[in-house]
């Protein structure tokens, strides 16, 4: 560094040095390019004053030092090369014609901060001796463009000789050599200048190679490539959505399904003949098919639409929907309805498990699945489970297993272990009995839902999935409709000689029927009788005379038409083998109590219909006429409400019980004069006899031709005492919530 220790005025000119000395000086000046410079030696570069540059006594060495931005006579270490900066004068707007186009990296320079001066220092690139001659030609070609009138010379060659361009000595430019480390790494605009001409051909060559590769592929490889491209597109869309702000906002719940679409889940559109998926399925006559197979539910977007509607609902409306769902589940009228609701809920949960969807803990299905196993057991407990499961009169091991699957695990001591919890955690496919397997599915799904909802309330910022809680793989082995198939299949395949067991199965599978003899009230009736009265009943004018007869006295006496039609018959479509036998006994033994209490009856004004033996063997046509169990007639004058009722003849010690008639009304049962006085063994139903008016004309009812055949009758022996739960220790089987399970 002895050259830098010399005084500036004592330094010889570059032209007086030999070529070897000049190379040695340049090598010493740029030997510190790769060494870090201490911060205290780094100083801001400032343009030199014109007086210093235009001084007559300044040598060529001084001019070279001024062009690199030396502001003082003291030595400072060499600064590594930096990328050039381009900025215009802050005060004056220069003419664009006076500024050259972007130059190659080897000849980059920047405009200064004030006065339009050019900073020609270490802002360029070094190591010009390694540059090729092509860059020199570019520099020479671009040197003819005027830069700034303040400069008159530039050192463009290795000898340091000044070059004049176009006869104007004021337009000079200095070439700053580039360093090997920074060669080619310039401003982005320079990259366009270097590679702009080769970008097009390279892209065309790449497309040509891709085209050749595609031509060489067969059909299978093309399909695999297509699937791979689709997968990459979905991944890129998800990453782009997460970074661009189209993903769910911070206020959206963690279980939001905005990122899940039918295309991303590979779901096919649901068939057009299905009922439109809605979050409020309250229409009684749905337009469309509601029976869906396993594949239609699991591999279409039908359930996805229903789940998205739950997410779009506001919180108050969603809570109302949960209440509606709870009452619909807990008020299921019969076994068929409850099994359909259970399989609907389990299929909905299976859909989330299969496609890996985050679960909404406030979903109406998750709110109601906790009590379904207890409801199902209550329905099954009305059957003769000892005969169905154990083929005996009392309870056996299979009945006890079914009860343990439903009951709540007990709180045992520390040294005792309740095996109920272990039984409920067994995989459902390990049970051989169909009812056990069906109950195990319901129990497993219930435990998974309760565990997930408990975890979601504790950890609010993390989405929850069913596979995290499905410990016995019940959701993996479940198929849509499996619970209904197992239970109904077991009931249909059961064969025994017990008539009561058959009757219980028949009643369990039949639609709901209304059975009530009378509706008492105290001072005022708060009962909503519109639930029992039919919408298409007789008018008030047809029953005006019957209302007037009841107003005449305190006691209600049957009319002549009612007394004349005391012989009751069961509808042939619902008559069973033991109903025929009871019917024959009822005709031979009429009730003496009713025969003594009833007044003498007139012959029937209308001939009764008789059914042939072939009609008795017709199939049963199920009818749910629970909304037409009472026929209401109002007197125009006194507004007297009259209900045509039927009193069932009791058999000691059973009380009076009401049975449903053929049209839904409850008719008064009195003995017919054509029979004896012995009581019937089984109460039978009586066809509707129209009430006779004052003129003696019979009123016609419009519902007689519209009502379908009735369901099977209920025998007298099956009263409320006999139909009571047969389970031992049934008082201990109280309904509980699965939220208390451990």
Curated annotation (Swiss-Prot):
Name of a matching Pfam family: Herpes_UL69
Places the protein is found: Virion tegument; Virion; Host nucleus; Host cytoplasm
Cellular component annotations (GO), alphabetically ordered: host cell nucleus; host cell viral assembly compartment; viral tegument
Top-level taxon: Viruses
Single GO MF annotation: zinc ion binding
UniProt KW keywords: G1/S host cell cycle checkpoint dysregulation by virus, Host cytoplasm, Host nucleus, Host-virus interaction, Metal-binding, Modulation of host cell cycle by virus, Phosphoprotein, Transcription, Transcription regulation, Virion, Virion tegument, Zinc, Zinc-finger
Keyword Iron belongs to the record: no
GO biological process: regulation of DNA-templated transcription; symbiont-mediated perturbation of host cell cycle G1/S transition checkpoint
Region Disordered: start-end pairs: 1-202, 540-742
The record's account of how the chain is modified after translation: Phosphorylated by UL97 and host CDK1, CDK7 and CD9. Phosphorylation by CDKs impacts on UL69 nuclear localization and activity.
Principal location class: virion
Ranges annotated as biased composition (Basic and acidic residues): 1-11, 153-171, 578-587
Family annotation (InterPro entries): ICP27-like
Composition bias type Polar residues, residue spans: 179-202, 692-703
Zinc finger (CHC2-type): 387-501
Regions of compositional bias (Acidic residues) in chain numbering: 614-626
Binding site for Zn(2+): 387, 494, 496, 501
Biased composition (Basic residues): 72-85
Keyword tRNA-binding: no
Family: Belongs to the HHV-1 ICP27 protein family.
Record's subunit section: Self-associates and forms high-molecular-mass complexes. Interacts with host DDX39A and DDX39B; these interactions are required for UL69 function in mRNA export. Interacts with host SUPT6H, EIF4A1 and PABPC1.
Role played: Immediate early (EI) protein that plays many roles during productive infection including regulation of host cell cycle progression, regulation of viral gene expression or nuclear export of intronless viral RNAs. Acts as a transcriptional transactivator via interaction with the cellular transcription elongation factor SUPT6H and as a nuclear RNA export factor via interaction with UAP56, a component of the cellular mRNA export machinery.
Name of the protein this chain belongs to: mRNA export factor ICP27 homolog
